Amino acid sequence: MKNIAIITGASSGMGKEFLLNIPSVIKVDEIWAIAREKSLLESLKEESNLNIRTFSLDLEKESSLMKIKDLLEEEKPNIKLLINAAGFGKFEKSTNISLEDSIGMIKVNDMALTSLCLMAIPYMKKNSNIINIASVAAFQPVPYINVYAASKAYVLSFSRSLGRELSKEGIHVLTVCPFWTKTKFFNRAVAKNKVIKKYVVMYDPTDVVKKAYIDMQKEKNVSVYGFIANAQKVLCKLLPHNFVMSIWCKQQKLK
């Protein structure tokens, strides 16, 4: 039985950083890299010295998830690590976002993540790990990013409760909640009229991933990198959410 790691959103951004650093935290025979863009996956495979198996799949489609499910049933690998890094957001007034994009966020950010967790768990043993990527937006409601923020709140809640359930089997679940991070995420998220005008700070994905792997090894439940991100996490616990939303709208000069 071969030991594998599975990672979605593997072709760029944090997903790529997580993939390239897998050997520093865990030993596996093969890495299953899942992303939409086949050319980027192939380039990643050629550039790295890792044993990568690529899958060009659109996780919005149920058929893509079924392909993974069928492959797991066929090969029955030992999954040492699952990283759900695929996801996207749209920053715009809700009524200006297409229904397709709004539902798409829920499908990729929540439904695909949940499906992959539930499909992978039967092939996991003691000391296996799941890393799910959420966001600091998970800590409070965020106008003009509301579907995205809500989808990440789901990831945080689902992951923390799943981690408690799986702790008896020795399977650890970590939720990573990044602040603004320098990735291609914004190429798709930001509308032409740029509703979000001010980014307090942009963190490097390398630092976010490094902190996440350290927190995984320490068996923490939530990983938040950076002073500002941690401050936001604390303030969102202490302050009324209506007040937090007002601060956000004032910062972005939104009504």
Feature map (PLM): residue ranges:
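Conserved glycine-rich Rossmann-like NAD(P)H-binding loop of the short-chain dehydrogenase/reductase
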Residues: 23-43
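Active-site helix of classical SDR
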Residues: 117, 151
